């Protein structure tokens, strides 16, 4: 019997877990190494384009999106200072006709939880917590990983999904700080009672300025 290829994914965020689920479905043995002592996701809502929705559907998350996400029919672009409408975007039937799927809004934590549950359903031991990568080396046809807790692993391949200050990237290409692009996005959660009347009609909007 041919042994399954073993892959390590460094980073247990949305990107790392999505990669893990896809590789599991391809028949590979996957370990996700997350530096935090428990799996959690911070942030607010994120948008899922029809292309992303197709990908998540392929990974078996269609029911999760239909249950946890919101699919707006329309979206209004508003000025960030006074919320006046600037333009309208149809997010419903026009996207279905063009791309075959809807546009969804979902809380990051809900998507993250669903991905983690799906990965663990395939292999309860797939996600390894409290493992912060300190070094990664190619040794022959294997990749050797060393973690801050002293543990070491050898795998056939490794995927770096450890964020903007990636240890994997630094090991491969040397040190380098993230470069500011000039764009800023403000994210947060506001109680519905404090939202001015009319701002959430339709209930999906983008504030720019």
What are the functions of these language-model segments?
Residues 15, 38, 165:
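Conserved Rossmann-like nucleotide-cofactor binding loop
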Residues 82-85, 104, 113-209:
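Conserved FAD-binding catalytic core of PHBH/FMO-like flavoproteins
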Residues 44, 48-118:
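Active-site-adjacent segment of FAD-dependent monooxygenases/related oxidoreductases
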Residues 19-28, 55-58:
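A short, Lys/Arg-enriched amphipathic alpha-helix followed by its capping loop at the start of a domain
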Residues 24-44:
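Glycine-rich FAD pyrophosphate-binding loop
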Residues 6, 29-31, 151:
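Structural signature of beta-strand start/N-cap positions in the alpha/beta core
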Residues 2-15:
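Beta1/beta-strand and adjacent pyrophosphate-binding region of the FAD-binding site
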């Amino acid at each position: 019997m041919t042994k399954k290829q073993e892959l390590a994914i460094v980073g247990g965020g949305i990107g790392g877990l999505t990669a893990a689920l896809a590789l599991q479905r391809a028949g590979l043995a996957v370990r996700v190494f997350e530096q935090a002592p428990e799996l959690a996701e911070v942030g607010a809502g994120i948008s899922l384009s029809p292309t992303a929705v197709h990908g998540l559907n392929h990974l078996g998350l269609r029911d999760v999106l239909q249950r946890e996400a919101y699919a707006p029919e329309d979206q209004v672009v508003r000025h960030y200072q006074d919320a006046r409408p600037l333009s309208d975007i149809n997010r419903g039937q026009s996207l279905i006709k063009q791309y075959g799927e809807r546009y969804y809004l979902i809380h990051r934590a809900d998507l993250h939880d669903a991905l983690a549950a799906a990965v663990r359903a395939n292999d309860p031991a797939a996600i390894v917590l409290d493992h912060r990568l300190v070094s990664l080396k190619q040794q022959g046809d294997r990749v050797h990983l060393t973690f801050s807790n002293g543990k070491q692993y050898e795998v056939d391949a490794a995927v770096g999904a450890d964020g903007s200050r990636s240890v994997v990237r630094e090991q491969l290409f040397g040190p380098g700080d993230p470069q500011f692009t000039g764009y800023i996005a403000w994210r947060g959660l506001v109680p519905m009672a404090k939202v001015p009347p009319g701002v959430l009609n339709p209930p999906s909007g983008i504030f720019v300025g």
